[in-house]
């Protein structure tokens, strides 16, 4: 439930596109070429006057480092707009897809709108005519739900603090197995019933097995980045549908407000569990759990991208089983073989390390609660489309503001408070003000 940039340190040597590179990262070749040496000042000045504009158009990255000579005026603002907007879009697309899947399911499959049970974390029912009793039950359900989330988060942080990577990895694998197999089987069965599509059980089991097996490989081992992102979106949508179905209506709204406050405290407080988790991962130079984080970054590891040794000059090392026990990569997962690039011409003996991941990372909890808010807006009451679209736009506006603050402060920030606050305000204002106004206009056949 946090958003953060993939950076190991708050002290950067570069800005704009490479602002996420830490001070310990090796300087790229383009940056080194742009810095004049003491012995070639005249040649640098000549190169600056003759080729600055041409090289800027062909390769803007060579001016990405601060202090590079010959940077044209306005290039910094152009790169900020280009790559800042790119990061926003790279998060808008998955969040939008997740919410679209949830809303489409709510509008078409009646199973997820039928109230025939509750979660064990919300034992108090709201089937009472008394408004006060219903409000009290929703508050009690919220306290129990938030307490469970706090305890499990602290438990996860303690396990990670003491390097219990295998236990955490097994925990995440069991959760992924349940989501990718059991919940997918239930979802697919209800969709087939809704659209009256006949399918025999062997074919259904085979489809679920193939879907789940590929998802487990992509999430917990290796696979294309796009496929991994797609499975994380599907997992978030399935979990959101479960919350929408089994959370009581009033309890769901109170839980959304409380979880945004908890997210604010857990990320920004010095001893907050999520902040301690991120800081510990940065100190150890390790990635956050791959099954809990959606990454919008371009990934250069062999596990997520295909490298052609003939064209890239890279050597892919074979997998060594002994590395599984010694490496802490991916929190106890088998290490991904790394690719080492050959020294570039003109730089003999210089060995470039693997380029650092850049981009914005968003927790899957944010996807889930964004979708819960929009799904509840689509499922409760009259299911008015104006209310649903208002919540959808509010979440995207809040996410955009969160990313703006992330670019300003350059540290892990909670992604729920702004979006959830806007979503709740837009929901209740649209449902109680805009919808009655539109209904009145329609009943009197007035058009604006």
Curated annotation (Swiss-Prot):
Chain span(s) of sequence motif PAL: 414-416
Start-end of intramembrane regions: 414-434
Main location: endoplasmic reticulum
Subcellular location: Endoplasmic reticulum membrane; Golgi apparatus membrane
Pfam family, one: Presenilin
Tissue: Ubiquitously expressed. Highly expressed in the liver.
Topological domains, Cytoplasmic: 1-87, 160-166, 222-223, 271-358, 410-413, 435-448
Region Disordered, residue ranges: 1-74
Lumenal side: 109-138, 188-200, 245-249, 380-388
Xref: InterPro entries: Pept_A22A_PS2, Peptidase_A22A, Preselin/SPP, Presenilin_C
GO molecular function, one term: endopeptidase activity
Mode of membrane association: Multi-pass membrane protein
GO cellular component entries: ciliary basal body; cytosol; endoplasmic reticulum; endoplasmic reticulum membrane; gamma-secretase complex; glutamatergic synapse; Golgi apparatus; Golgi membrane
Keywords noted in UniProt: Endoplasmic reticulum, Golgi apparatus, Hydrolase, Membrane, Notch signaling pathway, Phosphoprotein, Protease, Transmembrane, Transmembrane helix
SMART domains documented for this protein: PSN (SM00730)
Active site per UniProt: 263, 366
Family: Belongs to the peptidase A22A family.
Domain observations: The PAL motif is required for normal active site conformation.
Name of the protein in its database record: Presenilin-2
Origin species: Mus musculus
Gene: Psen2
């Amino acid at each position: 439930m946090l958003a953060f940039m993939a950076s190991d340190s708050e002290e950067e040597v570069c800005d704009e596109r490479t602002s996420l590179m830490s001070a310990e990262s090796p300087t790229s070749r383009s940056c080194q070429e742009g810095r004049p040496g003491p012995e070639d000042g005249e040649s640098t000045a000549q190169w600056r006057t003759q080729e600055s504009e041409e090289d800027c158009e062909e390769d803007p990255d060579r001016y990405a480092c601060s202090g590079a000579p010959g940077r044209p005026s306005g290039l910094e603002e152009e790169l900020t707009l280009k790559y800042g907007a790119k990061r926003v879009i790279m998060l808008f697309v998955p969040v939008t897809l997740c919410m679209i899947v949830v809303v489409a399911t709510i509008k078409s499959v009646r199973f997820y709108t039928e109230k025939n049970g509750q979660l064990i974390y919300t034992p108090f029912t709201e089937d009472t005519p008394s408004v006060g009793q219903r409000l009290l039950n929703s508050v009690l359900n919220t306290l129990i739900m938030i307490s469970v989330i706090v305890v499990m988060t602290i438990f996860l942080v303690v396990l990670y603090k003491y390097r219990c990577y295998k236990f955490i990895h097994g925990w995440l694998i069991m959760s992924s197995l349940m989501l990718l197999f059991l919940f997918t089987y239930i979802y697919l069965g209800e969709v087939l019933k809704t659209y009256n599509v006949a399918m025999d059980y062997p074919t259904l089991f085979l489809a679920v097995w193939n879907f789940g097996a590929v998802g487990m490989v992509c999430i917990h081992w290796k696979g294309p980045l796009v496929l991994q992102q797609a499975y994380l979106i599907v997992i978030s949508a399935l979990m959101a549908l479960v919350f929408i179905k089994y959370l009581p209506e009033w309890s769901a709204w109170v839980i959304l407000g409380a979880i945004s406050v908890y997210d604010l405290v857990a990320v920004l407080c010095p001893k907050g569990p999520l902040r301690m988790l991120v800081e510990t991962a940065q100190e150890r130079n390790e990635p956050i759990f791959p099954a809990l984080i959606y990454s919008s970054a371009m990934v250069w590891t062999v596990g997520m991208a295909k490298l052609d040794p003939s064209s890239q000059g890279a050597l892919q090392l074979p997998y060594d089983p002994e590395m599984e026990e010694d490496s802490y990569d991916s929190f106890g997962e088998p290490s991904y073989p790394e690719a080492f690039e050959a020294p570039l011409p003109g730089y003999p003996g210089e060995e470039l390390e693997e380029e650092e991941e850049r981009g914005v990372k968003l927790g899957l909890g944010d996807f889930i609660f964004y979708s819960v808010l929009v799904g509840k807006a689509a499922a409760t009451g009259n299911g008015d489309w104006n209310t649903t679209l208002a919540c959808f736009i509010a979440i995207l506006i809040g996410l955009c503001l969160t990313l703006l603050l992330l670019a300003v402060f350059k540290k892990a920030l909670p992604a729920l408070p702004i979006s959830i606050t806007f979503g709740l305000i837009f929901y209740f204002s649209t449902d109680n003000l805009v919808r009655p106004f539109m209904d009145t206009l329609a009943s009197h056949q007035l058009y604006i």
